[in-house]
Design a protein with these regions (language model features):
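Conserved subregion of the PPM/PP2C metallophosphatase catalytic domain
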Residues: 1-119
Length: 119
């Protein structure tokens, strides 16, 4: 079992047997209000070989020359179509796809990407 809290960030993604789950349970972002009104914990079952991918908004909000966002749908498609046997290969596939997508646009926000596989 994995217990988590999402504090207003992009939802981490869990992938198991080509089933994708967005980890959205949590609350408002830390520091957004003087007091946090409510925090909920999420609990999910984690099977062996489950992937967890965490990323910052700079990844999915990166624009290309046409002003189009990279977006969640594109990220999910890349994850499901990639060789996820090794996290380094998955991360490289995502970053190369983003670099190709953005064309000549500069990066305007930080991008962080973390992935792991539960054994």
């Amino acid at each position: 079992m994995l217990t988590y809290i999402n504090a207003g960030h992009n939802p981490p993604l869990m992938i198991c047997s080509n089933t994708l789950l967005q980890l959205t349970t949590g609350g408002i972002g830390v520091g957004m209000l003087p007091e946090i009104p409510r925090i909920r914990e999420g609990v999910v079952h984690v099977s062996p070989q489950t992937l967890l991918l965490c990323y910052t908004d700079g990844l999915v909000e990166q624009k290309n020359d046409e002003g189009e966002d990279f977006g969640m749908d594109r990220l999910i498609q890349i994850i499901l179509q990639s060789d996820a046997s090794e996290m380094k290969k998955l991360n490289t596939s995502i970053i190369l796809s983003l670099d190709k997508f953005k064309q000549d646009m500069s990066y305007v926000d930080d991008i962080a990407l973390f992935s792991c596989k539960f054994l």
